[in-house]
């Protein structure tokens, strides 16, 4: 699904719907790019609605882990989940790490390239409650499905883009009116509904950065390029 960003991709996994259908059927849960507030606050509700739609009356629980303490607590009580028909766990660490590489100098040093980034992630995983939970799931005979909502890419080259003040902020995709961009650098969608995306207004379009490009505004272009070059981003192709 495009964009390869959490608010679109992970909500789609839990709802079993395209973003366009989520907006139509569950406006109380769906938020578009400019809307204020968290964009992934209703994953549990989306999952419950999908199970209802599929006619699955099962015992299920949903957990979102955003720090070590909550992960450790769930791991310590993992055996209590054995009576569930379905247990869903969202583990946010890897996504948080990619954001930290942009914002924190110490993480930039530790994950200076793809090899170092993978090594840092592997080191975390080996010492995390997540590995403990996976091992316990095996011991308890659970059927275990591991997936992700999107990947990430080390962005090395900028591509200029111009948009109005309401254009979305993501560096690998943009949605808005009157977007100006380099055709060769993006996959452009003039009619978002054709790929299952909601349109903010009649003239809204989407563009998705290709390869290792990131989209940089002409205003403050040099600042954008120096700050975001060699950072891990997602949302594009």
What are these regions (language model features)?
Residues 1-237:
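Feature captures the catalytic ectodomains and active-site-proximal regions of enzymes
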């Amino acid at each position: 699904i495009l964009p390869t960003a959490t608010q679109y991709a992970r909500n789609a996994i839990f709802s079993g719907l395209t973003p366009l259908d989520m907006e139509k059927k569950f406006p109380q849960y769906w938020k578009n790019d400019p809307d204020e507030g968290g964009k992934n606050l209703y994953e549990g509700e989306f999952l419950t609605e999908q199970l209802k739609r599929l006619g699955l009356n099962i015992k299920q629980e949903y957990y979102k882990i955003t720090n070590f303490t909550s992960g450790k607590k769930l791991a310590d009580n993992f055996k209590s989940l054995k009576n569930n028909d379905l247990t869903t766990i969202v583990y946010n660490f890897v996504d948080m790490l990619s954001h930290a590489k942009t914002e924190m100098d110490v993480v930039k040093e530790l994950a200076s390239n793809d090899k170092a980034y993978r090594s840092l992630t592997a080191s975390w995983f080996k010492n995390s409650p997540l590995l403990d939970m996976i091992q316990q799931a095996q011991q308890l005979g659970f059927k275990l499905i591991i997936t992700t909502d999107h990947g990430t890419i080390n962005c090395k080259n900028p591509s200029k883009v111009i948009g109005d003040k309401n254009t979305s902020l993501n560096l690998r995709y943009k949605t808005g009116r009157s977007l100006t961009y380099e055709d060769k650098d993006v996959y452009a969608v003039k009619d978002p509904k054709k790929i299952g995306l909601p349109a903010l207004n009649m003239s809204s379009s989407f563009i998705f950065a290709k390869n290792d490009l990131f989209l940089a505004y002409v205003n403050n272009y040099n600042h954008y390029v120096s700050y975001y070059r060699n950072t891990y981003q997602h949302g594009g192709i």
